[in-house]
From Swiss-Prot:
<keyword id="KW-0699">rRNA-binding</keyword>
<dbReference type="GO" id="GO:0070180">
    <property type="term" value="F:large ribosomal subunit rRNA binding"/>
</dbReference>
<comment type="subunit">
    <text>Part of the 50S ribosomal subunit. Forms a cluster with proteins L3 and L19. In the 70S ribosome, L14 and L19 interact and together make contacts with the 16S rRNA in bridges B5 and B8.</text>
</comment>
<dbReference type="InterPro" id="IPR000218">
    <property type="entry name" value="Ribosomal_uL14"/>
</dbReference>
<comment type="function">
    <text>Binds to 23S rRNA. Forms part of two intersubunit bridges in the 70S ribosome.</text>
</comment>
<dbReference type="GO" id="GO:0003735">
    <property type="term" value="F:structural constituent of ribosome"/>
</dbReference>
<comment type="similarity">
    <text>Belongs to the universal ribosomal protein uL14 family.</text>
</comment>
<dbReference type="InterPro" id="IPR036853">
    <property type="entry name" value="Ribosomal_uL14_sf"/>
</dbReference>
<keyword id="KW-0689">Ribosomal protein</keyword>
<dbReference type="Pfam" id="PF00238">
    <property type="entry name" value="Ribosomal_L14"/>
</dbReference>
<dbReference type="GO" id="GO:0006412">
    <property type="term" value="P:translation"/>
</dbReference>
<dbReference type="InterPro" id="IPR019972">
    <property type="entry name" value="Ribosomal_uL14_CS"/>
</dbReference>
<keyword id="KW-0694">RNA-binding</keyword>
<dbReference type="InterPro" id="IPR005745">
    <property type="entry name" value="Ribosomal_uL14_bac-type"/>
</dbReference>
<keyword id="KW-0687">Ribonucleoprotein</keyword>
<protein>
    <recommendedName>
        <fullName>Large ribosomal subunit protein uL14</fullName>
    </recommendedName>
</protein>
<dbReference type="GO" id="GO:0022625">
    <property type="term" value="C:cytosolic large ribosomal subunit"/>
</dbReference>
């Protein structure tokens, strides 16, 4: 569960290291985002020479959450950190590599490019 002011690690090589959620997209009073949801975030920490800089406002898709999510078969999945991938307006990733595992739920939300770049899909 990601809400406003939540800090997330970045799971790609776009140049950002840490993001802070400033808005959860999808409804006027929507409070929480989970895996596969799009957020608007501010870059709080970035690497020099990256595509995005500190202070940039970007869109990102949540790929890992510490809060478990229930699957249709009754199993739960959770990760050790909150992480997101910076995306463009056409929902494709800004970076060219994805780091760490991502959840299978991204396939249902049509983030196929992220799924194909990820080293592990859980």
């Amino acid at each position: 569960m990601i809400q406003v002011q939540t800090r997330l690690r970045v799971g790609d090589n776009s140049g950002a290291k840490e993001l802070m959620c400033i808005k959860v997209l999808g409804g006027s009073m929507r409070r929480y985002a989970s895996i596969g949801d799009i957020i608007v975030a501010s870059v709080k920490e970035a690497t020099p020479g990256g595509v995005v800089k500190k202070g940039d406002v970007v869109k990102a898709v949540v790929v890992r959450t510490k809060k478990e999510i229930k699957r249709k078969d009754g199993t739960y999945i959770r990760f050790s950190e909150n992480a997101a991938v910076v995306i463009k307006d056409d929902r494709s990733p800004r970076g060219t590599r994805i780091f760490g595992p991502v959840a299978r739920e991204l396939r249902d939300k049509d983030f196929m490019k992220i799924i194909s770049l990820a080293p592990e899909v859980i």
